[in-house]
């Protein structure tokens, strides 16, 4: 028997998506710059800017969804260990004119064993179509520095009769050419979560939450990476072939002599690296989220709200592609130097923008128009895979902690009432972001902020 209160939602949608990136002729590669002295031709007429070809694309999308909320057991049914039981069933389908059709379901369950204690769980499948730029981009060129031409390092070490040393390997800048993948398919994922909520009736406004979650993704749109392409070229050249995505100039006489002395096929300077958008191998993520919220009302001192939240990333795994496995196998067998790796492949916990731990805590207070708040944020350390230490050791980006503080007063009558004045400080202790080499800014903007301590004054009026 189903409890009373069945809910149904249905919907359909049509949308037209269009994308146009039409740049000036001096930026899109139409007008080149020719050095009048050297005769060198640069495919952009603006200093410090790589050419970005004009791009456009469009598609039609039809979608439909259905959702059913089913109260299976209600409080008045008096079933042991089932105070309340609710289910949610849903499905969404979309048809894209360029990448095909998908349909994905969702099932969720909420089970109250007791008014104080809830167990919740959900399983869903999701999808994301590649955006129009990822499908239609036509050779976007960017110059990236800090790349290692491993075959040149190997040749230099062999010719000099020395051991391969990453400290002696000079970084090079390469032009990475990124183009769209017209055969890309929608990304698909499976999501599962199980958790509990405890709200003890003997303590007012106290809530504990604990949730475990897991996400498995397939056909995630991404790139292999220009450094990985160069590393693959290194492994293939050690075996007498090469990576066609790494385009090199004809070797000079000096390069021919160097590689010949090293017993390797001569290779010239890297001109460009083709790095097309592709559907990557499966990814798996798993973590646990914790939370504690407590609201405390007092007669004399006002209202306090305490919050603590933490997120633990237990697993972040990228299944290596066939090309990545070639590199990893060469390193494991000793064919390629152990300094060569495949950033973004295999275990990714603590790599770059994926700290193992993140947390925040806050306390706020309000009483008779007055208010104040104090918050603390923590981001755990990560490993910067784009750089190593002088002896080839991993480069650890330190954890980052910040504190924010504010005080406020809400006027009951000034400017018509409900007018709040707040003064506060963000990053109260003036922390600087830990140094990283992953971005030109020198830090991870997805994790850290370069804004030091700053004060602000905020005036808000409600009507």
Q: What is each of the regions a protein language model found here?
A:
Residues 1-6, 73-85, 116, 152, ...:
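Short loop/turn motifs that connect adjacent beta-strands in outer-membrane beta-barrel proteins
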Residues 1-82, 320-353, 358:
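Outer-membrane beta-barrel transmembrane domain signature of Gram-negative proteins
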Residues 6-10, 64, 83-89, 105, ...:
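Transmembrane beta-strands of outer-membrane beta-barrel proteins
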Residues 8-17, 58-110, 189-193, 375-377:
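Surface-exposed extracellular loop regions of Gram-negative outer-membrane beta-barrel proteins
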Residues 14-20, 72, 91-97, 123-129, ...:
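Transmembrane beta-strands of outer-membrane beta-barrel pores
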Residues 80, 211-386:
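Gram-negative outer-membrane beta-barrel transporters
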Residues 130-208, 273-288, 352-357, 450-454:
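Outer-membrane beta-barrel signature, preferentially recognizing the C-terminal barrel domain
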Residues 216-219, 314, 375-386, 409-463:
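C-terminal beta-signal and adjacent terminal beta-strands/loops
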